[in-house]
Amino acid sequence: MKRMVLFGSGGWIPSHSRETMCVPVEIGANLFLLDAGTGMRRFKSRIGSGLLDRHDKISILLSHYHLDHIIGISYLPLNFTGKRILIYAPEPAANGQEPEEILARLFDAPVFFPLSGFPCEVEIRAIREGEHEIDGVRVAVHPQSHTVPSVAYRIEDFLCYATDRRPTPDLVQYAAGVEYLLHDASFDESLFASITDPEARAEAMWGHSTAQDAARLARDAGAGHLGLVHLSPSMKETEYPALLEEARKIFPTTFLPREGRWIRFE
């Protein structure tokens, strides 16, 4: 069995309809979480509790250290008691700091209580660019251009997760032929039509991509399906279909994820 469910597909802050990034991926006996945003709260739901009933070990793959992608680590004491949690975090980290140092400093007094005091076993492992095998599953790590060090993850040939990134062409080869691509779609291209300089455009977008950027990349990579993620919380849910329509003009098999709905891989 290979499937995923989006518990969070929004960016920056949760909205009334979307949490920030968290994507559980179930591969047989393995459970991976792509990022740990506020979508982690959905482990209190029926789907979430069912996942935890089936898995005692969970591997969390962090794309980077911005709060909207890691704040859900603070939810571990609520839902993950007695579980073994392996947190894979990109290295080299921001400012040359080790992943364990960054996370231990954040989840410690006076901001929170230390990871060592969580009622679950938490282990932090640095993960570098390149090919890895985690519990028999092939995971490829690819660096991204963002405002801080960020990475994309490719899980075998069925999923590529690339959020919080500028639209650089190097991901085309990395995502080539993947069944599902989940890609940053924080903005609509029309917002930046007047900015012609690429560097100025990238700065205005805070290291993110447009839905059209995502669609072009999916098309060029020969992906099977494109899911638009890291959606802007400044947009209303009723505005997202227009974003989808623009992306579909470039890549017809684009979709807007519905949080809490399973997607099965071939």
Segments the model singles out, each with a brief description of its role:
Residues T168-E259:
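Cap/insert and terminal regions of metallo-dependent hydrolase folds
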